[in-house]
Design a protein with these regions (language model features):
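Beta-loop-alpha module in the N-terminal Rossmann-like domain of NAD(P)-dependent dehydrogenases
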Residues: 53-55, 59-81, 93-97
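Short, hydrophobic beta-strand segments that form beta-sheet elements in well-ordered domains
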Residues: 30-36, 49, 64-67
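Active-site regions of enzymes building and remodeling cell-envelope glycoconjugates
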Residues: 44-53
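General beta-strand structural signal in soluble alpha/beta enzymes
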Residues: 66, 88, 114-118
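Glycine-rich adenosine-cofactor-binding loop
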Residues: 4-17
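Active-site-lining helix/loop region of Rossmann-like oxidoreductase modules
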Residues: 8, 115, 120-259
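NAD(P)-binding Rossmann-fold cofactor-contacting core
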Residues: 24-44
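Rossmann-fold NAD(P)-binding glycine/threonine-rich loop
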Residues: 91-112
Length: 259
């Protein structure tokens, strides 16, 4: 029997993960699929559809992967960790220190794990490896306004006519203003200098046809890491997110080296 995966969200990423689980030659199997609008699950057999996440333990999942919205971690994260390992892709939920502490404590008490997915972060392992040695870390995103969710911010994307810095400051602040866009920034902060010290910049540029992520890190010993990655976008997600998430799932199953 393969590792049982529960998937929350049946959009661009969720659909791709379901397909990969189904094509994994028995290495993985589906425990359940949940979507806020259950009508979207018309192509999923009813026995795999889970309407009420409060009943998640009945599906006996080994790993639950959230690929929908940070509110699922806020509302159900502790419930999930009481019965399974949990991997939230909407990492911005973990910018809440109190919530993160509760999730970590729940995992400790129940022998489960809270996984931090790699997401679109390039160089995350190098950042984690050096730990407290980083003196300064900065992460910059450049995206077309159409690929940024401005609903929690003060900006009207229709008024952005050229390259515009829509946020510059600590990662903790941007996580609240752009919760669907900056999961990788939160991951970067959590594995390096922390949510208040790690610097974030979000630049909206109508001239872009891709998303660009830049990470810069300066160590106390004078060493420097600089990475830059560009990728096509689908909605607010980069197209590489599917491969990255699948790799994180394989690692969580023990099939690949790494965390």
């Amino acid at each position: 029997m393969g590792m049982k995966i529960g998937i929350i969200g049946y959009g661009y990423i969720g659909r791709a993960l379901v397909e990969r689980v189904q094509n994994s030659a028995g290495r993985f199997e589906l425990a359940f699929i949940h979507n806020r609008n259950s009508a979207v699950l018309a192509d999923i057999e009813p026995s795999l559809q889970l309407d009420d996440l409060a009943n998640v333990a009945e599906t006996a999942p080994d790993l639950i992967v959230e690929c929908a919205h940070p509110s699922f971690t806020q509302n159900y994260g502790e419930t999930f960790l009481k019965c399974a390992n949990y991997m939230p892709l909407s990492v911005t939920a973990l910018a809440d220190d109190g919530l993160r502490d509760r999730l970590e404590q729940t995992a400790l008490e129940n022998g489960t794990k809270l996984y931090l997915p790699a997401g679109a972060l390039i160089g995350g392992e190098a950042l984690l490896m050096r730990g407290d040695e980083w003196q300064r870390v900065r992460i910059t995103f450049r995206k077309h306004p159409d690929n940024i969710d401005f609903s929690e911010s003060e900006y009207d994307p229709a008024q952005i006519n050229g390259e515009t810095v829509v946020y510059e400051g600590p990662v903790r602040g941007i996580a609240h203003q752009y919760p669907r866009n900056v999961n990788t920034m939160v991951t970067c902060a959590l594995v390096s200098t922390g949510l208040d010290a790690c610097e974030a910049r979000l630049i909206a540029d109508p001239a872009l046809d891709c998303a660009i992520a830049e990470v810069e890190a300066w160590s106390k010993d004078g060493s420097i890491i600089r990475t830059e990655k560009s990728a096509p976008m689908v909605g607010v997600s980069g197209t590489e997110m599917i491969d990255s998430t699948w790799t994180s799932i394989q690692r969580a199953s023990g099939g690949l080296m790494g965390a």
